[in-house]
Amino acid sequence: MASVAGVSHQTVSRVLNGFSKVRPETRDRVLAAIEELGYRRNTAARTLVTRRSGSIGVITADMNHYGPASIMLGLESASRAAGYSLSLAGLPEISATSLRQAVDQVLDQAVEAVVIIVAHEAALALAHSLHIEVPFVLVEGDLSATPLTAGVDQIAGARLATNHLLDLGHHSVLHLPGPLDWLEATARREGWRMALQEHGCRVPALMVEGDWTSRSGYGAGRAMLAESRPTAVFAANDQMALGLLRALHEAGLRVPEDVSVVGFDDVPESGYFTPPLTTVRQDFRELGRRIMALVLRRLAGELNASVPLVEPRLIVRSSTAAPSN
């Protein structure tokens, strides 16, 4: 391969192992030689020689939801750039048995570290109770419980959304929460509450709890309109905001003229809602980089390594405006 590419064996090794200090044109020649020769790395042999598998185990549930799926994509990109591959194990249910089986599954593949994408309070508690023989990192966990956590600042994101509506002149903001056994949902609820209190506003009772789906947002919207007529609503994610928009439309209410709506996530479709949705963007690519940085620091022996939370960003579109009255 080195002969075909016209480079040294050391250069081929650096390209194969993902080192960044290789000139782009040299890397391209090596990759072309790999393609021409049909080279496939013998991972088992490499593991025996180096005692490193170059693999990170990832345990997650709820991959059908935008957040966990996007975290996986961001982590996959960051791990590849660092020269690692991912070994995935799913959780069919949140239980000690299921989590232990998933951990054993990835450990059987000789992974060097384990990343647990924690969305539920119960899963977080179970993760802390396990004995894992390799370094591990939690995603969207509780920073107060362990520094070995990477995530997006959900409280800050909810404050951005709520402050935006209050700064437009709305006297109160209702909140459509996600499932409150999810850590993200409870953090977004807390950020909403904090923003209202900082503005001296009364904190309204929570609306019907949603489950992240458009259907639940629609149902919560109908229940809300049967009891009150808000001027501003912060939905815990964009999909629930979409269902809420449908409920408002069916009730003959205009967005944003009658009711302003803010979502959370900035899913790719949110700019094409009717109207385009004001929302809070989570940078999952940056989150993937920080997860991988935390993994590498743990592998280097830093027992209390930490990384800062990713800061979310408010994306203002056409679903919010000052109250008409």
What are these regions (language model features)?
Residues 1-54, 324:
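N-terminal helix-turn-helix DNA-binding module of bacterial transcription factors
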Residues 223-325:
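Flexible loop/turn connectors
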Residues 11, 48-64, 164, 172-179:
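Short beta-strand segments enriched in small/hydrophobic residues
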Residues 43, 61-70, 88-97, 150-160, ...:
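Hinge/beta->alpha junction and helix N-cap segments in small-molecule ligand-binding domains
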Residues 8, 54, 112, 170-172, ...:
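Short acidic/polar active-site loop segments enriched in Thr and Asp
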